[in-house]
Amino acid sequence: MYELDGRLTALRTRAAEWAGDLATVGADLDHDPDAVHRVLDTPVMRYLATARYAPSADTPSLTSGGHRFSLDSVLEQVVFFEELAVVDVGAVLAAPGAPMAGPLVDLLGDEEQREWFFAQLRSAPTWVFFALTEPAHGSDAAGLTTRLDPDGDGFRLTGTKRYVGNAPRARLGVVFARVRPGPLGLRAVLVTAPAPGLTIEALPTIGLRGAALGAITMSSVAIADDRVLGRHLPATRRGVLSWVHVFNRIRPRVAAMGIGIARAACEYVRVHRRTLRPAARDRLDALCRRVEAVRQLNLAAARAVDSDPADGRLASAAKARAARLAEDVTVACLEYFGPGARLDHPLLGKLARDARGVEFMEGASNVQKLIVSQDLIRRGRPT
């Protein structure tokens, strides 16, 4: 079993302290996603707004217990985000910043693109969308149909994206598109909003309301050549193979959110059902052990990706297990409070609704299982 050392324990303590500010707005976000503006000046929101999640000279740092952190390691990220998610994952997702787009820009952007992009985040609270998922093919890069067509000295972007976090709030984003068939024909471009031909609408949801999911329609949106990420790189380093390194770093962070939701549900039962029959207590203990098992898997995944960003098999396994864990544990915990549990215990009901969303963040479980199975086959191991 992996135990957090003193340094990571200090980070966990600071995250738990900061998470208290999210508790004041979490329930309100369920009714009004714009309630996030009330907490933008809290330490946690200020930090999330400018975090880069990658080694950089201007990465903001936080201190705790005499240690300094910049969240440039995946292990630090999973420790930090799990604690925040225990309080309210919707509030975490409502934060300004570029938790997914930022690492991609750091990887593929040239110096001018990186400076321009991160200057936007430093200037004011800025929400950034990450538009990959499409209505017909989900997040399957091979089925991507959004087009980036040459147009004079630049390009025109045409297509539709769906289930894009923070899209209605964003004034900046990354869109994935295709310039030609095949894996080497995929590109990621920087887009500003509003823009002619760009339409963004909010999608109704019953869980993760703070994430403000949206649909994006692009009709010949003008894209300057200097907004195409990876233009200075060879084709093999700017397409989907490079994106995989970013996805591998993001998946343990998403898994940490699912684990945080499951932890919160178990802790809720322990607080509100102090007297349990032996069989019921055994079931709760089994749920808690399952949470810890997936947590250990995710910590191992984070260390593996930190060691080799191309090694994503554990990251995919952890993300799939955490998504199932969040759903199973929250539903099981509702059973401790009878038929009216969702009405009588709205916080637990919210956890159950939010848990459903983890499945669809950063690739559904069938995608993650394919990644794991392909890795096993490639390594010559039986499945």
Model-derived features: where do they sit?
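FAD-binding glycine-rich core of flavoenzymes that anchor FAD
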Residues: 107-128
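Glycine-rich phosphate/cofactor-binding loops in nucleotide/flavin-utilizing enzymes
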Residues: 337-383
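A short core secondary-structure module
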Residues: 160-199
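Glycine-rich beta->alpha junctions and the first turn(s) of the following alpha-helix
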Residues: 2, 202-292
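Amphipathic, small/basic residue-rich leader segments at the start of a protein or domain
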Residues: 1-92, 379-383
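N-terminal glycine-rich flavin-associated loop
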Residues: 66, 89-112
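C-terminal helix-coil-helix/basic helical segment that borders enzyme active sites and/or dimer interfaces
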Residues: 20-31, 270-278, 292-343
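A short, Trp-centered hydrophobic/proline-enriched beta-strand micro-motif
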Residues: 49-51, 123-132
